UniProtKB/Swiss-Prot annotation:
Originating species: Saccharomyces cerevisiae (strain ATCC 204508 / S288c) (Baker's yeast)
Pfam family, one: Zn_clus
Biased amino acid composition, Low complexity: 112-123
Coiled-coil ranges (or none): none
Name of the protein: Transcription factor PDR3
Further facts: Present with 166 molecules/cell in log phase SD medium.
Top-level taxon of origin: Eukaryota
Amino acid sequence: MKVKKSTRSKVSTACVNCRKRKIKCTGKYPCTNCISYDCTCVFLKKHLPQKEDSSQSLPTTAVAPPSSHANVEASADVQHLDTAIKLDNQYYFKLMNDLIQTPVSPSATHAPDTSNNPTNDNNILFKDDSKYQNQLVTYQNILTNLYALPPCDDTQLLIDKTKSQLNNLINSWNPEINYPKLSSFSPRPQRSIETYLLTNKYRNKIHMTRFSFWTDQMVKSQSPDSFLATTPLVDEVFGLFSPIQAFSLRGIGYLIKKNIENTGSSMLIDTKETIYLILRLFDLCYEHLIQGCISISNPLENYLQKIKQTPTTTASASLPTSPAPLSNDLVISVIHQLPQPFIQSITGFTTTQLIENLHDSFSMFRIVTQMYAQHRKRFAEFLNQAFSLPHQEKSVLFSSFCSSEYLLSTLCYAYYNVTLYHMLDINTLDYLEILVSLLEIQNEIDERFGFEKMLEVAVTCSTKMGLSRWEYYVGIDENTAERRRKIWWKIYSLEKRFLTDLGDLSLINEHQMNCLLPKDFRDMGFINHKEFLTKIGTSSLSPSSPKLKNLSLSRLIEYGELAIAQIVGDFFSETLYNEKFTSLEVSVKPTIIRQKLLEKVFEDIESFRLKLAKIKLHTSRVFQVAHCKYPEYPKNDLIEAAKFVSYHKNTWFSILGAVNNLIARLSEDPEVITEQSMKYANEMFQEWREINQFLIQVDTDFIVWACLDFYELIFFVMASKFYVEDPHITLEDVINTLKVFKRITNIISFFNNNLDEKDYDCQTFREFSRSSSLVAISIRIIFLKYCYAEQIDRAEFIERLKEVEPGLSDLLREFFDTRSFIYRYMLKSVEKSGFHLIIRKMLESDYKFLYRDKLATGNIPDQGNSSQISQLYDSTAPSYNNASASAANSPLKLSSLLNSGEESYTQDASENVPCNLRHQDRSLQQTKRQHSAPSQISANENNIYNLGTLEEFVSSGDLTDLYHTLWNDNTSYPFL
């Protein structure tokens, strides 16, 4: 039957494929273009054509059945949720599933183009599945014919039966590896077997994360064409499901790619500065991790080296069996640095008491951890009132708090190390309670490296002690049992908060955990973890219930935190890391199967949203307190309530950011998936506005500071969405954002006026500076997008704001000034010595092994200079600064990052060279670098990049060169 031609000259609707190809669509289902191209014809809900003839039979493609949502009702528990999203998701998937389309199904009327058919690829290591395809086509044709019949009960029964058979086929369709072919297969040494196993006949591009993807060219290309082409697709730091993948190297590459499109813009300088700042912050975060590693591995020596003190004798102060003995002199040297009587006044411990306990390492670990916890509590109290204290008193106290914080953390790390290897002693409740207390502090100051290492120990010890299993509680007294439960669930809660931020694989197996929940949960009708997950979504418990109403605010917050932790753990286990969605076989399955899985992912998101909303209902009293002011509630209650509200919001943003990586992996058509994800993005946009309003109205600037750790992730996720999805930013959004950051600037000014240079290593200062820098860069990105959207430059932007909010125009000007106090922390250490990326070491390490392997196999291109390889491998080049003044006169094309031999960016390299030799040596080094750089794999010399200083990059840096050097075309439009 011929397809009826449209009599209209224009159509008001178009299918997804016609819109993408920018060709005229007939507006009918299926359109003639999709029949010709042999592809799935999909109309999004808002583009669906009006049905003209329900009895018309269409060739080779199933007719869309009448859509009915009579059975889709929003339950009473989710009336306050955006049910429109859920309904539209169901409509979309109902449309896709009822059509039973597959991109590999042969058309009865049109021969498919096999010129680029991946089916012919000899690299496919799976068995042929034509049998399943033929069965699928058979069911397609049956359903097509059934839908063309007039509706009746018998027809519907046949349709249901056929669908059931089709579902059974889909569920049993599992790709099988062709083991004989695999055994005889000889992959190129540059690519792993896993890389080749992704080769399939259904698609030639598979996303691992939002910003990294596999293509069939990876197994066909002889050589990589950029630095990232030589590295794993999944970044070890950001992993599979990090909500901030946009901050990874591939994410930054996408940002640069977007800016290359705006090279003719009047905002070019601003965009180049922004890229530089992002790379600098990337560098700074790696340095933060490195410093954390140094602090915990050699705490005493590291501290004493910083203050230029060297102990003379070494007498053991630890247990005899310790593999890492402490030194009396080292410990005493650090203890004597504690500011007394200040420490005694806030912790209750004197220097004499500490020295008297040196013989007992476990006792010292408990004491210094108690001191550290008490110090954090008093420090928070001081900061909450610091803005009302006289300057002199404020400055002295602040200095004492900062210096003693670093000292106490040093002692805690030292005694953690020395007690770690006494397995019989650490497998006790006493030790775990100490460790949990230290973990809470680590989490508060965001010491990621130390937190992760201690968390692994805590999880391992508590699991070995049976804290997660009910069987180990039989026969013990209830007080001890509840103490064990409290420790376990605190460790569990901390671990899930860590997952929420990073998207990592959990250390805890959710399916092997069956101990009882704490008493407050049991009183509410939740006996254990499994029952809580089953009941929480439909719980009838109201905020006015005595079981919730009689809880103190702190206990209600503890309930909310553990409740959130449990649904996060379940989502990670059952969705993000579920083999059903993430196995290698799933990646090579046909479109229709992945669409089914994608439907389940959206159902899981909705289930998570329902549970999170129910937790918000249960803890509504906390939300009420957070929106109040002192003196209606104590200041500490206001702070803790605000932190919980921020954590609740942060969780939703993190989950959506994480699951977008999974959506990217399963998706077939970016436009269709983006249409679905945009619904969540719009909701996030509105919630971001609400969070801004919340932070504007909180009682003190310190509350904003306390919420900053949660707020930074929310803001960065939003900034990445602004860059990808271009939501409409209003001037009101700009104003509210500036009002929030104005409160942050008060804290920055406080540090600038009261912090001594010797206290720059204070964890509180470093963490605040890192968080505020990330927020500042996110805001700058959003402001740039506003300028692009409005087609104005920074001067017009400032003038526009000045007309409505003159008091904020100066702050907006600061955001566009890289010499501003806003960016001082990021750029201070590179004012003299130039820009030094930590990724230099990453590049160096990767290329070392790369060229060593090539040398072993004899695959090094003959360049007539073997010393080039040895210099790269040994990394013995002298360390000088290469930021010469002449560099600004020509584009920074030839990269020299790897062999530049630059000093750490925290040190001015010129200090190591006599003044009269500096210029000469710099020129010599520049010449050496240009001659000694080895030939890259792609036979070009642009695979390694040195940005130079900010001024050099802005005046002479080439965005296109930078992009092609590190990324080339290894970025694409992500699914956000």
